[in-house]
Amino acid sequence: MIIGIGSDLCDIRRVERTLERFGERFIQRVFTETERRRAARRPAQFAATLAKRFAAKEACAKALGTGFRRGVFMSDLGVVNLPSGQPTLALTGGAAERLAALTPPGRSAFVHLSLTDEYPYAYAHVIIEARDGA
């Protein structure tokens, strides 16, 4: 059962300008340690890597039905990879609480994430699925 869908399109050039203006302050405030490490390993695509993750956070906040309010913050959402390499999102804090509230009793939530970029755009699509079994 699908319990949430969200998508977001991010302009990589906007992330580049934000990095020029705010640098490390922006990176520390918005991205998790895992996301920062992944972007650092891709210096030629640094801004695009961050833009995809930014779009993923926005898409997930939409799928949760809250946006970034009601206790859901950018720092509560982090792009991680499953052992297969498939991207997903790890939710903490208010985002995890909202996900738990959305998930019907006796079901477990799974966050599907698709990421892509083609300069100057980065795109993310999130589907939150409630699966049988907790």
Curated annotation (Swiss-Prot):
Mg(2+) binds at residues 8, 58. It is an enzyme of class 2 (transferase). It catalyses: apo-[ACP] + CoA = holo-[ACP] + adenosine 3',5'-bisphosphate + H(+). Keywords: Cytoplasm, Fatty acid biosynthesis, Fatty acid metabolism, Lipid biosynthesis, Lipid metabolism, Magnesium, Metal-binding, Transferase. Its cofactor is Mg(2+). It is found in: Cytoplasm. Its EC number is 2.7.8.7. One of its GO terms (molecular function) is magnesium ion binding. Its main location: cytoplasm. It holds the Pfam family ACPS. GO terms for biological process: fatty acid biosynthetic process. GO terms for cellular component: cytoplasm. Transfers the 4'-phosphopantetheine moiety from coenzyme A to a Ser of acyl-carrier-protein. Belongs to the P-Pant transferase superfamily. AcpS family. This is Holo-[acyl-carrier-protein] synthase.
